[in-house]
From Swiss-Prot:
Gene inactivation effect: Worms exhibit abnormal muscle morphology, egg laying defects and constipation.
UniProt xrefs under InterPro entries: Troponin, Troponin_I, Troponin_sf
GO cellular component: myofibril; sarcomere; troponin complex
Biased composition (Acidic residues): 231-260
Gene: tni-3
Tissue specificity note: Expressed in body wall muscle from first larval stage to adult. In adults expression is predominantly in vulval and anal muscles, body wall muscle expression is weaker. Also expressed in vulval muscles of hermaphrodites and the sex muscles of males.
Source taxonomy: Eukaryota, Metazoa, Ecdysozoa, Nematoda, Chromadorea
Organism: Caenorhabditis elegans
Entry function: Troponin I is the inhibitory subunit of troponin, the thin filament regulatory complex which confers calcium-sensitivity to muscle actomyosin ATPase activity.
Name the UniProt record assigns to this protein: Troponin I 3
A single BP term in Gene Ontology: post-embryonic body morphogenesis
Protein origin, superkingdom: Eukaryota
Keywords: Actin-binding, Muscle protein
Length: 260
């Protein structure tokens, strides 16, 4: 009875809501299917636009081309080697068996033939070398003319110099020190001290005049005091008399000036 009640579907508002939800879900699925179909079609169109050569096919084609080029190169090398062997066979003469020949005339003939062939080959070699040297000289002249027209000169062959030579040269050279004082003008400055020192040097004893005068007065005073005591006075030097008279003359002049 309970199972039958569960399977019974009642009408009304709830049934309409369930129908709308089912319909919306179905529409959503249809839209998804349409979008998926469009994307697949677009992917197919895009793959068609890329062309026939996909990256994998390009890689295979590149590999095949490399293999074909290697085979062609080997074949060309084989052909060149065959041509070389063919030309060598044509130009070289098979040597006769000299050991088995006892006839001297036949041996002499073989010698003359070989000598003539060697001479001919040497002449051809000289002609070829001469032609090559002439062409090289012409090429050099043309290159010089072209460089002259361009305004450029051929670079000379530079001599290889060790890097240590330059280092030793730079270390050996001593830089001259610039002394700016030598360029200055020398000006002689005379001060009062210099004048005084010059006057001192000009005197005989290197002492000022006023010190000489005081010394002369001191020498004259003890001589006058000692004159009555000593029976025989020592003769005074002639230079002392004018020295003693000088201060007296100066005192008289000062007194006259004061009186005036």
């Amino acid at each position: 009875m309970l199972i039958e009640d569960e399977n019974i579907r009642y009408g009304g508002a709830q049934a309409d809501v369930e129908d709308d939800a089912a319909r919306k879900a179905q529409e959503r699925e249809l839209k998804k299917a349409e979008v998926r179909k469009r994307m697949e079609e677009a992917a197919k169109k895009g793959s068609k636009k890329k062309g026939f050569l996909t990256p994998e096919r390009k890689k295979k084609l590149r590999k095949l081309l490399m293999m074909k080029a290697a085979e062609d190169l080997k074949q060309q090398q084989m052909l060149k080697e065959q041509e070389r062997q063919k030309t060598l066979q044509q130009r070289t003469i098979p040597l006769p068996d000299v050991d088995s020949i006892n006839d001297q005339g036949q041996l002499l003939k073989i010698y003359e033939d070989m000598f003539a062939r060697v001479c001919a080959l040497e002449e051809e070699k000289f002609d070829i070398n001469f032609g090559v040297s002439q062409t090289e000289a012409e090429i050099n002249q043309l290159t010089i003319q072209v460089n002259d027209l361009r305004g450029k000169f051929v670079k000379p062959t530079l001599k290889k110099v060790s890097k240590y030579d330059n280092k030793f040269k730079s270390s050996g050279e001593v830089k001259e020190k610039s002394n700016f004082r030598n360029n200055l003008k020398v000006v002689k400055k005379e001060t009062d001290l210099d004048e005084i020192m010059a006057k001192k040097k000009g005197t005989a004893d290197g002492k000022p005049e006023w010190s000489k005068k005081e010394k002369k007065e001191e020498e004259a005073a003890p001589v006058e005091l000692a004159a009555p005591v000593e029976p025989e006075a020592e003769p005074e030097p002639e230079a002392a008399e004018p020295a003693a008279e000088e201060p007296e003359a100066e005192e008289e002049e000062e007194e006259e000036e004061e009186e005036e």
